[in-house]
From Swiss-Prot:
Gene3D superfamilies documented for this protein: Arf GTPase activating protein
Keyword Phosphoprotein: yes
One cellular component (GO) term of this entry: Golgi membrane
Location in or out of the cell: Cytoplasm; Golgi apparatus
Residues with Phosphothreonine modification: T135, T189, T349
Domain Arf-GAP span(s) in chain numbering: 7-124
Family annotation (CDD domains): ArfGap_ArfGap1
Protein name in UniProt: ADP-ribosylation factor GTPase-activating protein 1
In-chain residues carrying the UniProt-annotated modification N6-acetyllysine: K231
Length: 415
């Protein structure tokens, strides 16, 4: 890249000798120069000058290339106006020259020698210049044009070295291309040509990328499955150990202790005996209920609940009925103290077991006045209700007075 000193010198030179326009086409603000002649050219013309070869035109960039002091001196010695005036002053100059003819002419060779001599600080004269004997090449047919397609063969006859001409042709073909490629190398790259195998390469690359993605996902899935299986196995083993420990503590150890102490058979025998007693009690009670239902007899007093559990006191208040020895109907309206009766004395039709006679509460003696003479009759008959004397009623009332719980028999039925 040009140094600040180089930029300063070139800025001063540009302001002189019509250097602010292109020497070839007249474009404004040229950024390229031909150091050999000290002239300023544009970007397009710089490519054409490169095609001439460095022995005819050495091209440099004003801002992008590094400069030497001798090159700056050549720029001061040359210039657009100086070169044009020098060419027009020569006898062999023709305005219709092509670019190749112009810079291959004797006039151009003389000006090159002048610029190089002045840059070295020497005096130059036309008579003493070695370029006086310059003999330009004489081609049979001149095919050089400003825009020759790349790769077009050149039909020129050379008077110099054949190898040099071959190098010149190769250099010209590399720099002077077609119109669409003339900016190649200056920020504009030509896209590569598509080949037939590009499609296959792109397909294979897509296949490789897809397979890589699949393998990556499969490896991730396998690692996740492995981690899950390991975690599940650890949890299962932990639960199994906990279950085994609980079973050992709650079942096996107590059983072992009982076996050692000899208590396990006692526990088994006690459990079996309890179960048998419960089964026996349930079976006997069920059979007794069935036989009672079909025989029409009342339940035996031996199977009845204790006193205080009569149907008059079925509300369950045992504390109030604990002192009552007789049922309510046995003392209601009776003149004499009640006597003990057989278990079947509650029946209306059964005979009295103690006397061998029918019970006094039978319907056969309903309304009879001889209730007082029947001493062995049951006191809860209907005849006692009608035939009892006032004294009997008073005694019954007096007897029933202390037992307040018996008078409230109807109130305890929760009817």
């Amino acid at each position: 890249m040009a140094s600040p000193r180089t930029r300063k010198v070139l800025k001063e030179v540009r302001a002189q000798d019509e250097n602010n326009v292109c020497f070839e086409c007249g474009a404004f603000n040229p950024q390229w120069v031909s150091v050999t002649y000290g002239i300023w050219i544009c970007l397009e013309c710089s490519g054409r000058h490169r095609g001439l070869g460095v022995h005819l035109s050495f091209v440099r960039s004003v801002t992008m290339d590094k400069w030497k002091d001798i090159e700056l001196e050549k720029m001061k010695a040359g210039g657009n106006a100086k070169f044009r005036e020098f060419l027009e002053a020569q006898d062999d100059y023709e305005p219709s020259w092509s670019l190749q003819d112009k810079y291959s002419s004797r006039a151009a060779a003389l000006f090159r020698d002048k610029v190089a001599t002045l840059a070295e600080g020497k005096e130059w004269s036309l008579e003493s210049s070695p370029a006086q004997n310059w003999t330009p090449p004489q081609p049979k047919t001149l095919q050089f044009t400003a825009h020759r397609p790349a790769g077009q063969p050149q039909n020129v006859t050379t008077s110099g070295d054949k190898a040099f001409e071959d190098w010149l042709n190769d250099d010209l073909g590399s720099y002077q291309g077609a119109q669409e490629n003339r900016y190649v190398g200056f920020g504009n790259t030509v896209p590569p040509q598509k080949r037939e195998d590009d499609f296959l390469n792109s397909a294979m690359s897509s296949l490789y990328s897809g397979w890589s993605s699949f393998t990556t996902g499969a490896s991730k899935f396998a690692s996740a499955a492995k981690e899950g299986a390991t975690k599940f196995g650890s949890q299962a083993s932990q639960k199994a150990s906990e279950l085994g420990h609980s079973l050992n503590e709650n079942v096996l150890k107590p059983a072992q202790e009982k076996v050692k102490e000899g208590r396990i058979f006692d526990d088994v025998s006690s459990g079996v005996s309890q179960l048998a007693s419960k089964v026996q009690g349930v079976g006997s009670k069920g059979w007794r209920d069935v036989t009672t239902f079909f025989s029409g007899k009342a339940e035996d007093t031996s199977d009845r609940p204790l006193e205080g559990h009569s149907y008059q006191n079925s509300s369950g208040d045992n504390s109030q009925n604990s002192t009552i020895d007789q049922s309510f109907w046995e003392t209601f309206g009776s003149a004499e103290p009640p006597k003990a009766k057989s278990p079947s004395s509650d029946s209306w039709t059964c005979a009295d077991a103690s006397t061998g006679r029918r019970s006094s509460d039978s319907w056969d003696i309903w309304g009879s006045g001889s209730a007082s003479n029947n001493k062995n009759s049951n006191s809860d008959g209907w005849e006692s209700w009608e035939g009892a004397s006032g004294e009997g009623r008073a005694k019954a009332t007096k007897k029933a007075a202390p037992s307040t719980a018996a008078d409230e028999g109807w109130d305890n039925q929760n009817w």
